[in-house]
Amino acid sequence: MAYPELDAADFLQQLARRKEFKSLISPPVDQKKLIHDLRSHFVQIGGPGCEKGGRAFFPCDPYASPFPSIKGLQLHNAQLFVQNFQNPNTPYSRLLLNWQTGTGKSIAAIAIARQFMNHYMNFIENAPWIFVVGFTRAIIQTEMLRRPELGFVSYKEVAELHRLLHIAKQSGSTTSVESRHLNGFVSTLKRRLTDRNRGGFFQFYGYKEFASKLFNITSKGEEKNFDVLSLFHRSDEAEDTLNENDISQFVQKISEAESNGLIRVNQKIMEQLRGGLLIADEIHNVYNIQERNNYGIALQYVLDAFPPHQAPRAVFMSATPVTGSVMEYVDLLNLLVPRHELPNGQPLQRQQLFDNSGHSVKWKKDALALVERLSTGRVSFLLDTNTNYYPERIFAGKMLSYRNEMLPYLHFIECPMSDYQLETLKQLGPDPKISSNAYSIYDMVFPNPKFSKQTEPKAYGLFNSTETPAALSMASTDWLLENGVQIIEPSRRTPFNVSGSFLSLQPPTHISGLAFYSGKYTQMMKDILSIIRQGRGKILIYHNRVRMSGVLILQEILQSNGILNEVSSPVGTTRCSICAAIRDDHTTHSDHQFIPARFTILHSEIEPAVRERSLALFNASSNLEGHQLRILIGSKVIVEGLNFQAVRYEMIMSLPLDIPRLIQVFGRVVRKNSHMELPPNERNVTIYLYVSTTPDGGPELAKYAQKLKEYILIQEGDKALRKHAIDGFTNQIKIDKPMLESLPLSPSITPANVGATVLNTFEAYGYGEQEVKTISNIIISLFMARPVWTYSELWKAVSTPKLIQGITIDNKLFSEDNFALALVSLCYSKNQCKELCIQNRLCTIMHVPAKPEHLYIAAVLNYKKEPVLDIETYIRDFQPPTMHSIRITKYLEHSQTKEPFQVLYEKFQKDFQDEPMEQVLIHYPASFHYTMLEALIIDNLAGMGALVEVYKKFFIAFSKKDIQPFPDIFKIISHVPGDDDTLVGYATEDSVRLITSRQDKTWHEIPLYMLNINVKRKENDIVIGYMESKGKTLKFKIRPPIQVLKKNEITDIRMLNRGAVCETRGREEQQKIADQLGISLNLTKISAIKLCLLIRNTLLQKEMEARNQPNGMQDGIRWFYLFNDKMPSLVHTS
């Protein structure tokens, strides 16, 4: 076979020599030297000082980046490696992606799947399927549908998806029409992935769903309470060992259970998986000892049930493949290694690897060597700490010891328990064992109704989750008031919880506050206020639990100390998100406007759609500094699959189930490019790990000590697992000292000893064609940076490593033949010419007399993408112009003879010194008003109070006071400086534009209906007025109300009355309209022009009155359409 077998003695060496893998060794490059060499020898691109060096045919841009870049998604080297390793052309059946969080495992899995999909498309019939199984399958689908480079959607579809998503978010409702349109579009795209008739090859399942669909319990099985786990059980749960006969004969036992009518295996799924691909994300969830389930059994069955040559290929993913217990290595290896390649062709047993005879588990002699051997060629390991892409991780606090032994790796914020907590802890006796329903004592205790005053001697608190709710619910009203406790009654979606001043740092004098009940949460609250005072930065607070002392009480603590949820209105005690001062004391601060500090919360009892919306608001670029949402509180639902952007502080209030899951929590906020929008000095995350302590250490510190001890054993297994990682020589991960993510580790092969390059598989399996495409992209980016090249300069630039941002492969291994082929495809044609040739669509080839080389010059293209030929070609913009369609009629009506704003503004200042200001609405076009509104909002133009009042009377402009009744909207502009009367937005015909930053001139658009503006208000029964632009003038036009038009039966579309200039209507019609409008004047002596002015002004006055009635913008009668009103379409439909 072309590729080496896994059992070959020099497997990794043979693999590393192949060009498709060797080229992924990213060579070290001194960037300063690279820039110097480039400018001195062959290329002048951009950056400071570029004009002083290098040869060029055009002026350089000293403010440009010194390196060109390729736009769009570019797979990084680790992703390219596994794509090349696990594909239909290689014999390798199973692979574990052991990559740290945030490094792109999902993209890598999709890239692998795409190779198999391309292969399956060649099948005439019975093409296999690609199964994506895991709790995060929705995230993988999202990646597939937002990355056109992956080949599942077009750029146009992605643009449409973003448009619909933006509109749906603005609607503020998951059930709105806009949201339904978005969901329909997404469903259409998703069906393309899963519907074979539409070219789909994917099936997506959650672990539970996959297991339940694979194993269908029959009615007979249900009668006998049959459980699949009974066929795959641990023979001694106390010892946690497996019965060898049970595990080795599992497939046979499933067949027997099926024969006995207890179970029915889903044969459709089995046939779809035959020869297919199985992708399982967060694989550690399927065999976790602490959470018993049948997920792993289902995966093990589909991998073992087929003959080896028909079994599905498999890709497993996890940053922490072993979590709950080191003995999970047995389950992992049984999934990762095909049955026939395990020792003696039988599944591994725990007693083969571990000694469990004493009080602790130990690795057996030679067990780690066996792990090394079995994992060779089956593991990809990536640990990326490059500070160019990842934020720096900073631990607050200090290292602690427990029973004279220093705890490794972690720094803690030590929180001594309060006296009341200590007294409560005594109730559990010496060296207490904390049960699962008593975990609250790690964090806090609750007031106890058994004692009238909590300060009396020997008083102790409540902490047990089965006793506390009942005891507090039965407490008297007087006791609750006396102790500052408020009961939050449970509902269908809201569990029992408490609030009140006992959670405050500064309670009333007669009430014991937060410091009395919790040392940990008191320290947390003090740290939060300190962080806010220090400056900007978002905060993530994690707690593993929801109820009792979990995230629900954390939200009450924040609210009791002046931090609001997403929708509450500020009060006197609300804290400022910039300085942490309460609102009542904020008048003394002159350097910034009061912005209420807010938080949001994510936990399992909140609907997914609501969680997604809150996460989107927290991650939004407009919330980069945390001024809209400063804090997010999350339970264990955030541990996997969610990404948080630009978080500066992470507060961990409780240990997850184990240390590997703690690493996952760290990874939520330390992710690739997660902080790129922040200034370089703010690209860091400070982690606060809070622990409650007692004078002798305490039960929570003891829990950390035990879990860290277990984790050291897991780390030993991790080191063995990664020892012979397939990509160790390319990822070049060298760890010199123990760290949280890994013990010391060196790759078994280094770049220096890879050996000579082997080309046979590179050329045989299409990698040469891919190289041509890569070179073509590089050439295009070089031409976009500089329009004139010689052949030798261009080849040197293409073959220089790391010259192009986003390309990290070893360009020195590029073939010049492939470069020439790429250049031919971009520039040459069959035609020959002597002096000037323009071919194809990228570059011009010019022969310069007395020069040894042709010049390659970027072509200028017309809208048809045909080259334009003239002597200035080489200095023109390389980008082809965009072709736009223009509606001539609309252009003539709205575009020609427009007067500039400055001219109209001067005219306005002159004409409206004495005239009624309302008339400005009908004398100036929409463009003037929109420019004026933005000037009023951004620049606060002086002397415009009367105009502002007109805009506000007609609900065209909005102040902060106008937005305050809408809490969800107000938070968008609450941080904008100014008092309640400050203008912050204006209405257009489609939306309301709200200012988010005057300095940056950034706006946020929301639908009109979110401010109770109804664009389809009922028209009056008399006449409708509006202004229409005719060149430089505006004409007053009238038409019958739309309900009258709909009643008339018109057989000739030319007779449809769409409106006419008022002066052109007959005198009789004008007088009739005036009478109906109540214009009581002697109309016989009034000219048609003056009569129309009276009608116009009357309609405008009635429109203002209608809008100012209660709920007028929703239900008021329509009389006049202003410049920002959308006219209904008048179309003949008969």
Curated annotation (Swiss-Prot):
InterPro entries: Helicase_C-like (IPR001650), P-loop_NTPase (IPR027417). Keywords: ATP-binding, Helicase, Hydrolase, Late protein, Nucleotide-binding, Transcription, Transcription regulation, Virion. It catalyses: ATP + H2O = ADP + phosphate + H(+). SUPFAM superfamilies: P-loop containing nucleoside triphosphate hydrolases. Residues 524-725 form the Helicase C-terminal domain. Its EC number is 3.6.4.13. Belongs to the DEAD box helicase family. DEAH subfamily. Putative initation factor. This is Early transcription factor large subunit homolog.
